[in-house]
Design a protein with these regions (language model features):
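Detector for outer-membrane/organellar transmembrane beta-barrel domains
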Residues: 56-144
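Transmembrane beta-barrel domains of Gram-negative outer membranes and organellar outer membranes
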Residues: 1-56, 63-68, 77-79, 110-111, ...
Length: 167
């Protein structure tokens, strides 16, 4: 990775009884750094050459304000969730209206699905870092419906909201 780009590799097992594993690669590029009045903005793509199980794309902005750190983004694919809004990119081209869903066994760039689909969704979070303690409180909104995980016996999320304490 570089100061403006990061990459992630994931290898996930869904159900060992049927040997259901999936790998995916994610790339995120920072478009610009946080400034006094502007948030840091990045664009990312998950599952670049995978089977599409994790595929999502996003644009995300982050801004620190005092002891708080705020994040807000728009996502497609898994990050669209149930779809908060119509995909705004359809206004640019009808190509963005239909999301490719046949990825075969993976291993090939699946650019036909990038930033596409009828819907997009919002995600975000906030964190508060205590000055006097190495502790932060976090709140997150994640619209992912975890369809694959639920289909193989995983728990269905009851809420898109999560809270955490980090120390």
């Amino acid at each position: 990775a570089t100061p403006w780009m990061e990459g992630t590799f994931r290898y996930t097992g869904f159900n060992r009884a049927i040997y259901s594993y999936d790998r995916n690669y994610e790339a995120k590029i920072r478009l610009w750094e946080e400034q006094e009045y502007l948030p840091q903005v990045a664009v990312g793509i998950r599952d670049l050459v995978g089977t599409g199980l994790w595929q999502s794309e996003y644009v995300v902005a982050s801004k620190a304000v005092g002891d708080f750190d705020f994040t807000l983004g728009m996502g497609w694919g898994r990050l669209a969730g149930k779809g908060d809004i119509n995909n705004p990119l359809i206004q640019l081209s009808d190509r963005f209206a239909i999301r490719e869903t046949d990825f075969g066994l993976g291993g090939e760039l699946s650019s036909g699905a990038f930033f596409s689909g009828k819907k997009a969704g919002f995600f975000g979070g906030a964190a508060y870092q205590f000055d006097s303690l190495p502790v932060s409180l976090m709140l997150e909104y994640n619209p992912d419906q975890y369809e694959k995980e639920v289909s193989v016996g995983g728990l269905k999320p009851k809420s898109p909201w999560s809270a955490a304490v980090k120390w």
